[in-house]
């Protein structure tokens, strides 16, 4: 293989954890938290300040509650499934492998579920959802490079609660909070922060459901009725990192800046794919192509061994790390296009 004369400044194109902001360094983090008791007033106030910043930056309604979960987004979504769901039939929208995973978790609990699934690059039917059902969906699926686009399809007279995994869309897409009752995400995607902590955002309707389910048997670590902000000991270094990345995001210009940055990044890859004859987008309709992750299939049949050699070469030469397709998805290329990625590195 021919070594390129020009290389990327950063070869980090993983879809999570993602590349750090360029200005990030360990020395830039506040270390005054380390060694402090996590339930002390000092730390409690620090967490409150971060959550308030988060709500302001993301325009989360003031009457929505923000909670911390262990186990990143996975822990957050399990907390929601166990604590909030089960009373009503659930319409699950599945177009990526994470949505399928969460649907299988719902099945294990024997909740009533209407499954609308498509894993072939097409979006399942979104309209005519029973208003009394709960709704469950992933906003952006990095395993398929697809996104729900918007949630205008959710009925205005929806009496069931709406649950969404927004990990790969928050900070990049315009989230319609008023239509979401339980939204979960982690820190390690759009803003390049550290993993292992999940955020849960609950609407007043979700909080009412939580009260209704108060007597439900739920494992302590994921019981949302059993916490105010945090349930176990968080990493205070990760909190400091999160605050740094939030500040970086805000100073760059927030959502308007990030949304444009992602669109510009994706456009670079779209033009690249259109100009070659060996790759194509997995997502069939352009409007469902994700802002944060692009996923491409090979048009012609290729041998996995040969493609693995290419991936190894790109990694060895520090050109591109971690661009293999998701492990359950068809063989292809998956590249993160979030706001920490530089356009010139994609070029």
Where are each of the predicted segments found?
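Conserved active-site segment immediately N-terminal to the catalytic lysine
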Residues: 177-188, 198
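N-terminal "arm"/small-domain region of PLP-dependent enzymes with the aminotransferase-like
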Residues: 1-41
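Conserved C-terminal alpha-helix-loop-beta "cap" of PLP-dependent enzymes
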Residues: 274, 278-344
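Active-site phosphate-binding strand-loop segment of PLP-dependent enzymes
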Residues: 120-171, 182
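Active-site C-terminal subdomain of aminotransferase-like
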Residues: 188-272
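PLP-dependent aminotransferase-like
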Residues: 75, 82-135
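Conserved N-terminal alpha-helix of the aminotransferase class I/II PLP-enzyme fold
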Residues: 27-79, 83, 95-105
């Amino acid at each position: 293989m021919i070594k390129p004369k020009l290389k990327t400044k950063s070869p980090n194109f993983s879809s999570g954890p993602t590349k750090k902001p360029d200005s990030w360094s360990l020395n830039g983090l506040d270390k005054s938290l380390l060694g402090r008791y996590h339930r002390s007033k000092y730390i409690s106030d620090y967490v409150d300040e971060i959550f308030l910043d988060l709500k302001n930056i993301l325009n989360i309604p003031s009457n929505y509650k923000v909670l911390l979960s262990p186990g990143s987004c996975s822990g957050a979504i399990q907390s929601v499934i166990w604590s909030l769901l089960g009373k009503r039939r659930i319409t699950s929208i599945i177009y990526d492998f994470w949505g399928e995973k969460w649907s299988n978790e719902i099945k294990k609990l024997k909740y009533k579920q209407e499954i609308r699934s498509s894993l072939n690059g097409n979006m399942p039917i979104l309209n005519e959802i029973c208003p009394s059902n709960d709704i469950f969906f992933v906003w952006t699926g990095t395993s398929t490079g697809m996104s729900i686009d918007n949630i205008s399809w959710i009925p205005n007279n929806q009496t069931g609660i709406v649950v969404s995994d927004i990990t790969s869309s928050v900070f990049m897409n315009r989230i319609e909070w008023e239509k979401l009752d339980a939204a979960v995400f982690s820190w390690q995607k759009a803003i390049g922060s550290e993993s292992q902590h999940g955020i849960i955002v609950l609407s007043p309707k979700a909080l009412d459901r939580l009260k209704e389910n108060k007597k439900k048997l739920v494992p302590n670590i994921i019981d949302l009725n059993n916490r105010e902000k945090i349930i176990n000991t968080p990493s205070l270094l990760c909190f400091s990192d999160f605050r740094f990345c939030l500040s970086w995001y805000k100073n760059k210009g927030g959502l308007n800046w990030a949304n444009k940055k992602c669109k510009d990044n994706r456009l670079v890859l779209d033009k690249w794919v259109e100009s070659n004859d060996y790759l194509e987008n997995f997502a069939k309709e352009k409007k469902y192509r994700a802002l944060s992750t692009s996923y491409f299939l090979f048009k012609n049949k290729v041998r996995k061994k040969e493609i693995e050699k290419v991936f190894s070469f790109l990694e060895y030469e520090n050109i591109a790390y971690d661009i293999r397709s998701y492990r359950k998805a068809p063989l292809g290329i998956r590249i993160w296009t979030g706001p920490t990625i530089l356009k010139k590195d994609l070029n």
